[in-house]
């Protein structure tokens, strides 16, 4: 892992890397979803390469270019369908983010497409996806997955349940800027909203992979204007802990990252989040990444708060989420009983949850 971190930090040219170590580094980079970026960093540092490793890096670059072409074409097609429907969506992450932060679509790994539309436009957006061959999955409390062969589109009307983290998505959509992706019109989040979203996205995945932290490192460098103080829009000031933790994690990767958050967090909260960042970073370096389930994720959300009374409000909100959301197992449970309507599924959810309680 140390050699991989050195390459990501721009320190890889300081020593020779044996072929066996290269293979370990490349396997780790693939597992951490940063393989094309590591190759690009090695190229920029002019790291000496044996013929075998040089050939391997060429192969990685070819595969990344082919994959990026596929996802770029898929994103263009979806945006084109939305344009025909009179919709302009905000691509979240994916090829558009790769262009903006990494400099090329082939340098950031994509496995699906995420697009954000207003909640009132979800039905029209779904119809537009159906028209180009997508089929719908089961919606949850803030998005719905759509499928077509090897492509998954996650269609969002929010970026998380507002009871967990209220992104105030309506304000973010109003502030979104006109943009285009390879000639196809779309929208993009304002820089401060995009940075907050990327911090929230990393928290939602519990910083399980280096790719999440590389996104944040580049975002803090390129979306904040450098060392000047960075401030959230007032309506999401309550999410400042996400930025504080995101910056702390980005600095674990790039310690010289210079940025001031305004207003600065209280000293006790800063110490708490720095300690949390230490634990997350140590786990990332020593344990294989595992996507957290819903309960583990919401337990992690509580860790962002100081221990004691500050966690009471989030606990109550998470209980409301647990009681009010419906997910795929709820639909499957209701279907076994012959019920299919969403309101019926919602009514039966408490029964499903109770059926999972172990009997003594």
What residue ranges belong to the model's regions?
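Conserved NTP-donor binding/palm subdomain of two-metal-ion nucleotidyltransferases/polymerases, i.e.
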Residues: 1-111, 117-360
């Amino acid at each position: 892992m140390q050699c991989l971190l050195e390459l990501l930090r721009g320190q890889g040219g300081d020593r020779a890397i044996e072929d066996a170590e290269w293979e370990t580094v490349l396997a780790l980079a693939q597992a951490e979803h940063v393989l094309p970026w590591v190759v690009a960093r090695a190229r920029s540092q002019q790291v000496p390469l044996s013929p075998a490793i040089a050939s391997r890096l060429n192969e990685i670059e070819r595969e990344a270019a082919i994959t990026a072409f596929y996802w770029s074409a898929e994103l263009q097609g979806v945006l084109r369908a939305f344009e025909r429907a009179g919709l302009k969506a905000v691509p979240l992450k994916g090829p558009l983010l790769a262009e903006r932060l990494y400099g090329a679509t082939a340098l950031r790994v994509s496995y699906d497409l995420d697009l954000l539309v207003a909640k009132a436009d979800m039905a029209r957006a779904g119809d537009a996806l159906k028209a180009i061959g997508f089929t719908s999955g089961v919606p949850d409390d803030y998005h719905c997955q759509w499928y077509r062969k090897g492509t998954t589109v996650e269609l969002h009307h929010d970026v998380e349940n507002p009871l967990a983290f209220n992104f105030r998505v309506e304000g973010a959509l109003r502030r979104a800027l006109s943009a285009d992706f390879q000639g196809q019109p779309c929208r993009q989040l304002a820089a401060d909203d995009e940075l907050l979203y990327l911090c929230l996205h990393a928290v939602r995945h519990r910083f399980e992979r280096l790719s999440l932290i590389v996104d944040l490192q580049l975002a803090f460098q390129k979306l904040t204007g450098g060392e000047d103080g960075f401030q959230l829009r007032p309506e999401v000031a309550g999410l400042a802990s996400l930025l504080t933790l995101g910056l702390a994690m980005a600095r674990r990767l790039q310690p010289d990252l210079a940025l001031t958050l305004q207003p600065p967090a209280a000293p006790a909260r800063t110490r708490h989040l720095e300690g949390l960042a230490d634990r997350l970073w140590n786990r990332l370096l020593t344990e294989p990444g595992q996507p957290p389930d819903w309960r583990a994720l919401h337990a992690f959300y509580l860790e962002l708060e100081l221990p004691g009374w500050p966690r009471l409000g989030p606990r109550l909100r998470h209980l409301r989420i647990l009681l009010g959301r419906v997910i795929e197992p709820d639909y499957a449970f209701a279907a076994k009983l012959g019920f299919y309507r969403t309101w019926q599924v919602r009514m039966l959810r408490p029964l499903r949850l109770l059926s999972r309680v172990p009997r003594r």
